[in-house]
Amino acid sequence: MVLFKAKFSFQRRVKLAQTLWLLSWLSVLVGCLTFGMGIFLKVQLWIHNEVMDNTTAHAVPNTVITAGLVGILLGYFAGKISQASMDLTKYQRWKSFMMPFFFLAILSCIVCLAALVLSVALRGTLEESLKIGLRNAIRFYKDTDTPGRCYQKRSMDKLEMDFQCCGNNHPKDWFEVQWISNRYLDFSSKEVKDRIKSSVDGRYLMDSVPFTCCNPSSPRPCIQIEITNNSAHYSYNFQGDDVNIWVRGCREALLGYYTGIMATNGAAVTLSFLLQASVLVSLRYVQTSMDKIRDPDDVEADTEGFLLEKGVMETVNSSLEKIKDLFKSNQVETAEGGGEGAAGS
């Protein structure tokens, strides 16, 4: 049973070809936008790679970049086909490329949908990766002389300044680790000895944060040492508005930042998907309506076009059979070629 059959006069075929041409180049432009957004997200994830536990989230920009590239290529070739569809002689040159084109176009739509699903599904994975990565970055903050960890301090300092955040979940995360290297501690000092002895595992812990947690907009000089001790500072209340360090955790800040970029990527991919689907449908109508024209001198004849010649399942099964037959014929040709080569030697 033919699905979505439509009649096309010569004028309607011309308008269809013009519409296809416009949609094709819009698809190219949106593909460029999608590709650029994917590259931007990839770079941003790479910049903060040191405060992430794994690179699973990179699957999102990789898929978006792929969707953008495929969209550009398919849009370009669809535009070329639309221009050739008005000349039966030129159109015949593209006829053999139609089925591979449709296969790639459907695959491209699937990639777009996969990018959308990954943008939503990997949010939890990204949050967990940031949670573990930031926790390790804070723990290794002091290890500036240790190979593999020497850039953790710089990465964490830059992150807190750029995103106006402090710690993993909140500033108190710094209270739970020794973030000052033993290299810069005076072990002859009674205060240092007392702090180390008071810690269960012999660490130098204090209720203080790095300078990068300070809010430069505060009129008061930054209070970054003995933050929870109200009596250590004049006219100060830790529970009130006197705190002049960032109270937002870096995980929340980064997650919000990446979620915003992914939402923009999702919008670009959605638009790309809609355009590619429109190009696919339009090109299918162009193909089926042009295939009805047998005589090159009868280009202006009325024809019929359709999306599917059979039902959906029948079309899928028929396509799978054609693909299987194609692979079988290739295997036979390869085997015959190998046999001839062996006989010749």
From Swiss-Prot:
Sugar-bearing residue positions: 54, 229
**Keyword Membrane attached:** yes
Per the UniProt topology annotation, the Cytoplasmic ranges are: 1-24, 81-99, 291-345
Q: What is the membrane topology noted in the UniProt record heading this document?
A: Multi-pass membrane protein
**According to its UniProt record, in which tissues is this protein expressed?**
Rod specific.
Listed under GO cellular component are:
plasma membrane
- List all membrane-crossing ranges: 25-43, 62-80, 100-123, 265-290
- A Pfam family recorded for this sequence: Tetraspanin
Q: Name one GO biological process term.
A: visual perception
InterPro entries of this UniProt entry? Peripherin/rom-1 (IPR000830), Peripherin/rom-1_CS (IPR018498), Peripherin_LEL (IPR042026), Tetraspanin/Peripherin (IPR018499), Tetraspanin_EC2_sf (IPR008952)
Q: For side Lumenal, which residue ranges?
A: 44-61, 124-264
Q: Which UniProt keywords apply?
A: Disulfide bond, Glycoprotein, Membrane, Transmembrane, Transmembrane helix
Q: Which domain of life is it from?
A: Eukaryota
What S-S linkages are listed for this chain? none
Where is this protein found? Membrane
Q: Which residues form a coiled coil?
A: none
Keyword DNA-binding listed: no
Stated family = Belongs to the PRPH2/ROM1 family.
Assembly notes: Homodimer; disulfide-linked.
- Output this protein's name: RDS/peripherin-like protein xRDS36
- Which gene is the coding source of this polypeptide chain? rds36
